[in-house]
Structures are given as C-alpha cells and as structure tokens.
C-alpha cells in the first residue's frame, strides 16, 4: 500500500501533533493497512472516507481526538491522506473544503 499525503494534511499533522506527528501518522497508517475501508463514506465526495484517530497531545482517544479524510484507490493500492482536523476545532468539513475535495478526487481518479 502506498500512502500519499496532501500538503494540507502534512501541515496540519505537524501543527496538531507536534513532536508526536510520526506516532499519529503511524497510527493512521496501521489502521488503514488493517482495513483500508474503515472510515465511513462521506456523501457527495466521490468515495472519500472519514475516520478517527487519537490525539496524544491533548490526551484524547479516537472519539474526542483527530478526524481525517482520505481516498482509497483500491486498483492502484493508494491511500491519499487529504485533511486532518482536531474535533474540538472543527468536526466536519465546510462547504468550501467539500468543493475543493470534490475537485481533488476528480483529478486523482483521472491520473
């Protein structure tokens, strides 16, 4: 499996997880390797899934921790990590973020 991080995902990972960024990324990757379809599909986003992971900086488990959105392209064995958010800051995507993700998915599926 190949993991591909968007610039936005990587930036937020560093901001939110600080020196624990590698641990958070490993936890996400381990979860997705075990089950690439683990997250729930977000309606209207072309197959993007939303899942949870813990937040070691704030001492939160999966329920109160971080949310991430990803696209699993099964044929290519690629997982695109797209967005990472702190649940306390923002639990779901804005209209603008959803529109941007729809465009990203269209491009990724074309390649």
Predicted regions and their residues:
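Basic, Lys/Arg-enriched alpha-helical interface segments
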Residues: 1-62, 75-76, 90-111
